[in-house]
Amino acid sequence: MNLTLVLNGERRVMEAVRTVAELVAALGLDPRKVAVERNLEIVPRSAYGATELADGDQVEIVHFIGGG
């Protein structure tokens, strides 16, 4: 199933992605090091697997980067 998402401001077609967890994995990201917002609502990490995506969803993913 293909979904068209607005991902970090860019329109992207994602294949075989149904949930936030699948999206994070498809992008090769470590779920422990990102925060995800779907349609202006923060998605708790514990809900990534249960949060289904729909065509046209707006998703923002922010990476945590350590520094000093």
Locations of regions flagged by a protein language model:
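Ubiquitin-like/PB1-type beta-grasp interaction modules and other compact soluble beta-rich domains
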Residues: 1-67
